Amino acid sequence: MSMLLNLYRKALNLPLSLLVKTRSIPTDPVNELGLKLDQPIVYVLPYTSQTDLLILQKNCQALNLPDPLVNNDIQGVSLSRFVFLDEGRRFFKSKGAKSETELVFYRYLDLNRNDEQLDIQVVPVSVLWGRAPGKEKGLPVLRLLGTFQRLVTMLWFGRDNFIRFSQAVSLRYMITNHGTDENLAQKLARVAKMHFAKQRYSATGPQLPDRQAMFNKLLQSPAILAAIEDEAKKPKSSLEKARKEAEKILDEIAANVRHDSLRSADRVLSWLWNKLYQGINVQYAERVRKLALEGHELVYVPCHRSHMDYLLLSYILYHQGLVPPHIAAGINLNFWPAGPIFRSWGAFFIRRTFKGNRLYSTIFREYLAELFYRGYSVEYFIEGGRSRTGRLLDPKTGMMSMTLQALQRGLTRPISIVPVYIGYEHVLEVDTYAKELRGAEKEKENAGLVLRVIKKLKKLGQGYVNFGEPIPLNHYLNQYFPEWKEPLTDENGRPKWLNSAVEAVSKQVMVHINNAVAVNAKNLIGSVLLASRQRSLTREQLIEQVESYMQLFKNVPYTAEVTLPTDTAEAMLDHVINLPRSGVISEKDNFGEIIRLDRQSAVLMTYYRNNIQHLFVLPSLVASIVLHHETVSKDLIIQSVNRIYPFLQAELFMHFKAEEVRGHIEAILAEFVAQNLIKNESDMFVINRQRIRSLQLHSSGVRELLQRYYISLSILIEQPEISRNELEQESRSIAQRLSVLHGINAPEFFDKALFSTFSATLKEQGYFDEEGDTIVSKVQSTEELIRGLISVEIQHTVQGAMVKLEEVNNI
C-alpha cells in the first residue's frame, strides 16, 4: 500500500505543478505565527486528501517549514509529521483515520510529558479550493471534494487555491493546563474540528442573498412601511407611488454580489497591481483573521486616499483568506460600465446627502442593518471623501451612527471596527487634487475619466495596507457608555448616549488609523526636502537627516504599529529619484551632489509628507523650543509642549493622553542628546552648534502649524469679541496672503476646516468664558509662546495683513 501510495503521489504532482497555483495565508507563517523551528511541528489537515498533503509539502518547501512527509524523530521515536482529522470520501483513505489521529496525538503528548524542554507545536492547515459561499436558494459551492473530483476541480479552481496556516497549539501549554486529563487527545481533535469549521466560514462568509427576496423582506419592515406611508401623504403622491419610489431607492442602493465576478476581479486586480505598483505591503492582517474566526461582525473603516482604495482593500482581504466586504461607495461611482461591475464586487451606493429625505435615510439604514444581521462584513470611508491634502479629514459620522444603532437592535454577533491605513508612494489622482485645491472644479467621474487614468498606468512604487488596532464595539460601549443598552431617548426619539458615543468612536478610529501608518521612502525623503527652505540639500545632508529620523522613529516609536522601511537611507534616496514623476532631482557640480525637489512637485510632495506629519510634530516642537531658547530647562520645554499639544492632538488625531506627553518628550530629549543634536549640561538642554543644521531641519515639521495658530491668536487679541465664523474667515484670508508672500507650499495651509478645528479646540481648552467671551490673558500667553517659535518675517506679514483687513472692514 505504501508503494502504491507513493506512486499515486508522484502521479498527482504533475497535474498539481501544471494546474495549481497556491497562495499561502499568511505569506510568512514562521514570523507571523511565531513558529519555533527548533521545536517539532505536527500539521493537522481536516480531511484525508493526498492532493492537499502534496500542496502542503510544496508550500512548506517554499516557506522553509519542515517537510510534512518526513517524520519527526523525537527521543528515538519516529512519528508522522502530519495527521488527518477525518476520513472524508477518498479512494486512498486511512481506515479509522480519526482513531489513528488520536493515537498519534497520545504519543506526542506522552513525549511532551517526559521531556520538559520539549514543546511540540500542532499547526492546523487547510486547503481551500474556491471560496464561493453559495446562494440562499442553492447548495454550498465549497464542498469537501474527493480525489477524482479534485482532479477535475484543478481545471476550474487551480488558480483560486489557498493554503491557510493557523496559530500553532502548544502541547506544552495543553499539558500544563490539562495534564491529568485522560481525554486530552480527543479534546485536541475536537477543538481542531471546530477550528476548521469556523475557518471555512471566515473564508467564504454567509451565503449570498437572493436580491429580490431581500428587497421583499425589507419592504415589509415596520420602519420602511412607516416611511412609505409618510411619503404617501405628500402632495401629488400616493401609497403606490411611494412604494415604487422605495423599490427604486433599494435598487439604487443595494449590491448584487456574484462570486464569479469576484474571481474575475481577482485576476484583473492582480494584473493591475503588478502593472501599477512594485509591491503591496500588508501588515497586521492576523489580528483581523483572529476576529473573523471568533465570529465577529467586521466593519472595515479605512482612510481614503484614492479611488484605488475600494479595489485594493477587497483584493488584500481576499488574499488574506477573508471575505471581501460590502462597500459603501459614493453614488458618483455608479456610472456605466463601472457601476454594475462595482455592484457585482460588493459595492452598495450612497448619496452624498439625504438630509430631510426620510424615505431614503430609512431604507439605507434598514439595508445596512440587514447586512449586519446576515453576517456580511462591511466597509465604509468615514472621511466621506478622498483626502485632497494627504491628511486625515474630520470624520463624517452618519455611517458610524447607523452601525451603533444596528448593534443596539440586538445583533447576536459582536461588531468590531477595523481601522485601516492605506498609503501609496504615488496616488493616481494627486495632480487632480492639486488643481482642485487651486480652485478648479471637481471633474465628475465617468468612463472617459477612467480611460485617461488607465493611460497613466505604470510603475508607481509601493502600496501599503496596515490593519490598525480593532475596536470591539460591545466592549467599548460597555466601558465608556454603559447606558447604551437602556431604551432612553431624547426629544427626537434618538438614544441619549448615541451622539456622544458616535463622536467618540469615530475619533478613536481616526487615532487608530494614524497609529498604524507606514513610513516609506517617498514620504520620508519628501519630508526632509520640504523641511529645507530651498527644498534642496547636499546628498550627505539628506542622508544624515533621513538616518536621524529613522533612529528617532526606532528609538522613540510613535506606536509599536508604525511600520518603517528596512532599506538604507542611500537605497531609499535612489529609489525615490528613480520613481516616475517624483520631482526629486539629482544634480552635480564641482562641490558634489545636490538633491532638490522641483518647484512644481513641491505641492504634490506635501501630500505624501502629510501622511506621516503627526509622527514628527512633537520632536519638531521640541527642536523649535530648544532652538528658540538655545539653553532651556526640561520643565520649560514640557510646559511649552503641554500648552500647544491639545491643538496638535485635535488636528492630527494624535494618541498621547495629557499624562503621557511628559514621558514621550523626555524620550525625545534623550534621543536628541544621543544623536548629539543637543547637549545636556547641568539639567539644561543646550544646542550643539556643530549639528544645528540637523536640528533646524527637525524643527520645520511643526512650522506651518504654528504659523496658522499664531494667525488666529493674533486676531483674537485684536478683536476679542469676534465671532467664531468671522475668526475662521479672517484667519483663512491672512493664511492665503502668507502662503503667497512666503512661498508656503502646503495645500492645507489655508484650509477652512483646520481653522474650524483650531477654534473648536480653543473653546474646549477654556479660552472662552461661559458667555463665549475671549479670555484675553490666556490667549496672550499662548500667542506669546508661539510668537517666539516663528520667524520675525512671518510675524510682520501677519500683523501687516491684520492692518489691511481692519482697513477693509472699516470701509
UniProtKB/Swiss-Prot annotation:
It holds the Pfam family GPAT_C. A motif (HXXXXD motif) lies at residues 303-308. It comes from the Bacteria. Pathway: Phospholipid metabolism; CDP-diacylglycerol biosynthesis; CDP-diacylglycerol from sn-glycerol 3-phosphate: step 1/3. It is a peripheral membrane protein. GO terms for biological process: CDP-diacylglycerol biosynthetic process; fatty acid metabolic process. Coiled coil: none annotated. GO terms for cellular component: plasma membrane. It is found in: Cell inner membrane. Keywords: Acyltransferase, Cell inner membrane, Cell membrane, Lipid biosynthesis, Lipid metabolism, Membrane, Phospholipid biosynthesis, Phospholipid metabolism, Transferase. GO terms for molecular function: glycerol-3-phosphate O-acyltransferase activity. Its main location: membrane. Its EC number is 2.3.1.15. It catalyses: sn-glycerol 3-phosphate + an acyl-CoA = a 1-acyl-sn-glycero-3-phosphate + CoA. Belongs to the GPAT/DAPAT family. The HXXXXD motif is essential for acyltransferase activity and may constitute the binding site for the phosphate moiety of the glycerol-3-phosphate. This is Glycerol-3-phosphate acyltransferase. It comes from Glaesserella parasuis serovar 5 (strain SH0165).
